[in-house]
Amino acid sequence: IFVPSMFPTISVVDPDLMMRVPPKCTTYQGMDAFFHASESVINKNEHIVAEMFALKTIELIAKYLPVAYKDGSNKEARYYMAIANTLAGYYMNCTSAHTMEHVMGSYHEDLVHGAGLIMIAHAYYDFFAERKAAEEPMIKMAKAMGVENPTSGKDFIRALDTLLESIGCADLKMSEAGITREEMKLYPKRIHEVLGGDI
């Protein structure tokens, strides 16, 4: 549902208000912004301005989220994470990763959105990398994350795995959220029926 009233006329983005946000919340919200950006980059409806904002978002989050996770009072990290989250909000051309997570969340009310995205991230992007379906965009994202001379989508996935490890999220499992293989079989139909998206 997108209506004008969903979008604020003015937003106050103040890093000082974020200093006491707990580490887990910091990582989940930060990675939600990261995936909004990464999905904008690989989206088939790509836009040059969206890509510019998204790649900068990815660069900032890769650099500053681990710092904010380890030291929530680090003002520089909070400042640049606030910038990254703001940039990610300008263009949210989501792909099926967000669609799948929304369906996961509809079955599990306690599943934090960012955590759900992290759970599916490696397999999701590996699906594209194995098929070389988004090589150029994924190479761009790897560069944004600081990878030197990336040559394939796999380089982005390795950088993503390293980022998740650095923020204590490498071991999040769907099974720990109560998600079963049988339940997952229901997801494709649910995605089409409720959200109208592909997978």
Regions found by a protein language model. Give the residues of each.
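Active-site segments that bind and position negatively charged phosphate/pyrophosphate groups
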Residues: S40-K154, R158-A159
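Short runs of predominantly hydrophobic/aromatic residues within well-ordered alpha helices
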Residues: T27-G30, R78, L117, M184
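C-terminal charged capping/lid subdomain of soluble metabolic enzymes
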Residues: K140-I199
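A glycine/threonine-rich phosphate-anchoring loop and its flanking beta-alpha core
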Residues: I1-E46
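Glycine- and other small-residue-rich loops at beta-strand/loop junctions that grip anionic moieties
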Residues: P23, A50, E176
